[in-house]
Regions:
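Secretory targeting and sorting signals
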Residues: 1-8
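Solvent-exposed N-terminal domain segments of exported/luminal and surface proteins
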Residues: 10-160
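Extracellular secretory-pathway ectodomains of glycoproteins
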Residues: 145-233
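Exoplasmic/lumenal beta-rich domain surfaces
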Residues: 229-277
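Beta-strand elements of well-folded, non-transmembrane domains
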Residues: 239, 280, 293-299, 320-326
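Short tyrosine-centred short linear motifs in exposed loops/low-complexity segments
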Residues: 269-291
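Internal, hydrophobic beta-strand segments that form the core of beta-sheet-rich folds
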Residues: 285-303
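Short beta-strand elements
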Residues: 301-329
């Protein structure tokens, strides 16, 4: 029997709990269930980048893992797993000593401490043994975070702990699960722009719709829905030798969900509400036009909770070839 750092025994990409007939104790992945409630599910999609570079979701939190019966089965038939987010126990004896035979156990990380043992896995009681979860445990600098040894919580109760999950925890988690469509803008001219003549840019209505993702943590009553709403398209022509329309490069989304205005015959000399004018030809090396949609993020959750999260962006790029104006000899 051995007690080792958790990352020494591997995580294997499975989460703790019961998966089919397999019972495991791993801390690398959450048991949060994520479903997309609304929005596009087809075509090329990607995740959002937060516009707030200082924002990031919590690195870890606690989740219910085992019922008393499940812990008994795991301890007596397996016994290899993570008893905390950083500490692994190899061998059934460590598990049975602490969770069956009331033997106190060492928590080596953070502030070392002794943890009081349990009697017979708390069989007959209603509740769950909770443990720390971190999608990337190696990114956590503070070893005290979420590092309690697996602990008991009565059914229906959330731990009184600063790292206990909340609806906002789930909203933050869902933020990184939101997938939005690529920003494939319509252009006119479509294949090659001309120096000093505007290129019209637009997106038809229906291309971008709200995306809503629901996250639920089983056996807690906690849930949150994170909604991403497209609010603007930003154009970067890929060169300083260009003008954008509007000057900021930010094209607002129209009331019907479209962006910009489609080009019509006779519009060549007009200024587009959303577009670009290149001032210099490419001469063999195309400019890289980037188009990024800004998504406004809000959330609502259990208990009437809700609020705003940082806006997110998703960017795509495409080549732009620009030719000189062709002179006409008379």
């Amino acid at each position: 029997m051995t007690s080792v750092p958790a990352n020494a025994i591997g995580t294997g990409g499975t989460y703790g709990g019961v998966e089919g007939e397999e019972i495991s104790a791993e801390a690398s992945q959450s048991r949060i269930k994520v479903t997309q409630v609304s929005g596009s599910t087809g075509g090329k999609r990607g995740t959002l980048s937060s516009t707030d570079l200082n924002w990031e979701p919590p690195p870890c939190w606690y989740e219910p893992l085992f019922t008393p019966e499940q812990l008994k089965t795991f301890a007596e038939t397996n016994g290899n797993g993570q008893v905390s987010i950083r500490q692994g126990w190899i061998g059934s004896e460590l598990w049975t000593d602490h969770f069956r035979d009331e033997k106190d156990a060492n928590n080596y990380f953070g502030t070392p401490s002794m943890v009081k043992g349990y009697k017979n896995y708390n069989l007959g009681k209603k509740g769950y043994f909770w443990h720390g979860v971190a999608p990337d445990v190696n990114s956590i600098d503070d070893t005290k975070l979420c590092n309690r040894l697996m602990f008991w919580q009565n059914a229906g109760d959330i731990p009184d702990d600063p790292n206990a999950p909340t609806p906002e925890t789930l909203a933050d988690y869902a933020y990184n699960k939101v997938k939005v469509p690529e920003t494939a803008v319509e252009l006119k001219p479509a294949t090659k722009s001309t120096v000093n003549l505007p290129t019209w840019v637009w997106l038809d209505k229906g291309t971008f719709q709200e995306v809503k993702v629901r996250a639920e943590l089983p056996n807690t009553g906690l849930w949150a829905e994170t909604t991403a709403k497209p609010v603007a398209l930003h154009l970067n022509p890929g060169t300083e030798d260009a003008q954008t329309f509007p000057a900021s490069g930010d094209c607002e989304i129209n009331a019907d969900g479209s962006i910009g205005t489609p080009y019509s015959t006779g519009d060549a000399d007009k200024t587009p509400p959303c577009g670009i004018r290149y001032l210099k030809a490419t001469n063999g090396t195309p400019y890289r036009l980037s188009a990024s949609v800004t998504w406004q993020i809000t959330w609502e959750g259990a208990g009437g909770t809700g609020g705003d999260l940082p806006d997110g962006t998703f960017e795509t790029t495409q080549d732009m070839n620009v030719q000189e104006i062709q002179a006409i000899n008379r």
